[in-house]
C-alpha cells in the first residue's frame, strides 16, 4: 500500500506538472503578447522615422533646387552685366565707325537707293549737316530731322505711303549684337 506521504507526493507532483504546463503556456502567451506589442511599436516608429526621413529629404531637395535657381540667376545676372558692358563698349566705339569712309559711303548708298522726293530723313544730331550735304549732292528734295534716339545711320519716312525704313545703327547694332551674343558669351565665359 501506498502511504499518505507518497500519495501526497504523487498528487503534488501531478499538480506541479499541471501548474508547470499552465505557467509555460501563460509565459508563452505573455512572450507572444510582448513580441506583438514590440513589433507593433517598432512598425509604428519605423513608419514615423521613414516619414521624417522622407520629409527631410524633400526639404533638402527643395532647398537644393532653390539654391540652384539662385545660383543660376546670379550667374545669368553676371553674364548679362558683362554682355551689357561689351554692348556699351561697342556703342562708345561708334564714333570711330561713323568717321570712317566706308560708313559715309554706305550711308550715301542707302540714301541714293532709298530716298524719294518728299521723304523725311531722321538721323543723329551730329550727322544732320552731313546727311543734308549728301541729299543736296543727290539733288533730292527731302527734309532732314534729328532724332536723339538714333546713334547713327538714317530712318527714312515716306509720308505719302506711311512707311518708315530703318537703316539706323541702333537697329543694325541690336540685330548683330543679338546674333553674336552666343559667340561673345563663349569668348567671355568659355560657353557655347
UniProtKB/Swiss-Prot annotation:
One Pfam family linked to the record: vATP-synt_E
Functional note: Component of the A-type ATP synthase that produces ATP from ADP in the presence of a proton gradient across the membrane.
Family per record: Belongs to the V-ATPase E subunit family.
GO molecular function: ATP binding; proton-transporting ATP synthase activity, rotational mechanism; proton-transporting ATPase activity, rotational mechanism
Main location: membrane
Transmembrane segments: none
Subunit structure: Has multiple subunits with at least A(3), B(3), C, D, E, F, H, I and proteolipid K(x).
Location of this chain's protein in the cell: Cell membrane
Record gene name: atpE
Domain of life: Archaea
Protein name (Swiss-Prot/TrEMBL): A-type ATP synthase subunit E
UniProt KW Acetylation keyword: no
Membrane topology: Peripheral membrane protein
Annotated organism of origin: Metallosphaera sedula (strain ATCC 51363 / DSM 5348 / JCM 9185 / NBRC 15509 / TH2)
GO terms under biological process: proton motive force-driven plasma membrane ATP synthesis
GO cellular component: plasma membrane; proton-transporting two-sector ATPase complex, catalytic domain
Amino acid at each position: 500500500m501506498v502511504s499518505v506521504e507518497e500519495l501526497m507526493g504523487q498528487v503534488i507532483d501531478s499538480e506541479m506538472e499541471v501548474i508547470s504546463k499552465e505557467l509555460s503556456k501563460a509565459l508563452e502567451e505573455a512572450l507572444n503578447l510582448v513580441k506583438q506589442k514590440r513589433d507593433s511599436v517598432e512598425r509604428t516608429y519605423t513608419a514615423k522615422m521613414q516619414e521624417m526621413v522622407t520629409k527631410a529629404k524633400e526639404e533638402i531637395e527643395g532647398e537644393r533646387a532653390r539654391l540652384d535657381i539662385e545660383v543660376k540667376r546670379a550667374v545669368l545676372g553676371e553674364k548679362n552685366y558683362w554682355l551689357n558692358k561689351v554692348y556699351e563698349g561697342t556703342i562708345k566705339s561708334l564714333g570711330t565707325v561713323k568717321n570712317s569712309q566706308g560708313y559715309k559711303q554706305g550711308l550715301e548708298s542707302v540714301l541714293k537707293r532709298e530716298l524719294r522726293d518728299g521723304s523725311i530723313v531722321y538721323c543723329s544730331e551730329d550727322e544732320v549737316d552731313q546727311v543734308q550735304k549728301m541729299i543736296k549732292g543727290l539733288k533730292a528734295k527731302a527734309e532732314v530731322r534729328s532724332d536723339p534716339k538714333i546713334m547713327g545711320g538714317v530712318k527714312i519716312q515716306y509720308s505719302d505711303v506711311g512707311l518708315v525704313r530703318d537703316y539706323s545703327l541702333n537697329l543694325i547694332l541690336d540685330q548683330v549684337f543679338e546674333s553674336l551674343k552666343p559667340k561673345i558669351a563663349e569668348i567671355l565665359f568659355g560657353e557655347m
